[in-house]
Amino acid sequence: MKSATPDDLPRTGVEPDLSRSASECFESLWNGAIGMRSLPLTIAGARVLDAGVTCSGSLEAGLGLARLCLGDLANVRYVPATADDLVGLSVTIQTDHPVLSCLGGQYAGWPVSVADYFAMASGPMRCLRGKEAMLEQLHLSRQATDDDFAVGVLESDTLPGEDVIEAMADECGVDPSRLCLAVAPSTSIAGSAQVVSRSVETALHKLHALEFDVTRVVSAHGDAPLPPPAKKGDTIGGIGRTNDAMLYGARVTLWVDAEDDAIDSVASKVPSQSSDDHGRPFAEIFKQYEYDFYQVDPMLFSPAVVTIHSLQSGRTWRHGQISIDVMRKSFGL
């Protein structure tokens, strides 16, 4: 039998089953819901974990939602913040499956709109739904099998109704009983934490938008300050603070197996400061564009500081800067 050579092996090794890992994570959260001040519900046969809509949720629920988005293929935790972060805690993430966990799972690429209901959906269920160009380009979308559970997180200040559940299950190709959702608004503790855990995801999505081969990213680490939640019901405030934590406070480090020229061509463009919209609290930017995400410069949505280590040459690139004054204004400090 011929032995495999290094060139025969995938750069990042054999990838795990994202949907199965997410399903196991959901079971753990579902069984521990009460301890996380969350409420387990059944809606139209689907299991829905309320982590901040009608209940208070918790810091622990925030970590759980972040893990769920990532298919539990990343380590997410709270760490003491630095003086530059202005707050007490930061959310840190590290992963050795960056493309699968962050772009296949965590990216909020599904705008759920059914009748009067709207939510931004993330999680591995997106791969079963498909319909996203990025998932197709990265070969991450697939049809559901009889064994699959569609698992995801909704950012919304209301719970989905039966019509929403049925529509989402249909798009994922599963029975409603195999749909597993967690829901939290951006103004809740859990909702804030799961959004702020997206530091690495925003860097990878930016690289993909810059047409860099993101499969060359082998491992990644990121952190961002956990902002104080906005007042309950102030959705724009919640979106603003969590985005500002990312745009002006997030730091990401990527370990990349690529040639220097390829890295050099994009490194300075990855941080948020490369956008013309950079420099003001996101709530102000959002208002300028009449609260239409699609009018905001897509190059804005990225971390404040990005460091890239080349595994081929040993070189390091570091670009961007932390913007304390913008965060102070956004966080009401």
Curated annotation (Swiss-Prot):
InterPro entries membership: METHMP_CycHdrlase (IPR003209)
Main localization of the protein described in the UniProt heading: cytoplasm
Similarity section: Belongs to the MCH family.
Gene Ontology MF: a single term: methenyltetrahydromethanopterin cyclohydrolase activity
Protein name: Methenyltetrahydromethanopterin cyclohydrolase
Catalytic activity of the protein: 5,10-methenyl-5,6,7,8-tetrahydromethanopterin + H2O = N(5)-formyl-5,6,7,8-tetrahydromethanopterin + H(+)
Function: Catalyzes the hydrolysis of methenyl-H(4)MPT(+) to 5-formyl-H(4)MPT.
NCBIfam families xrefs: one_C_mch (TIGR03120)
Pathway connected to this protein: One-carbon metabolism; formaldehyde degradation; formate from formaldehyde (H(4)MPT route): step 3/5
SUPFAM superfamilies: Methenyltetrahydromethanopterin cyclohydrolase
Swiss-Prot/TrEMBL GO biological process terms: formaldehyde catabolic process; one-carbon metabolic process
GO cellular component: cytoplasm
TM regions (residue ranges): none
Coiled coil: none
Keywords, comma-separated and alphabetical: Cytoplasm, Hydrolase, One-carbon metabolism
Assigned EC number: 3.5.4.27
Compartmental location: Cytoplasm
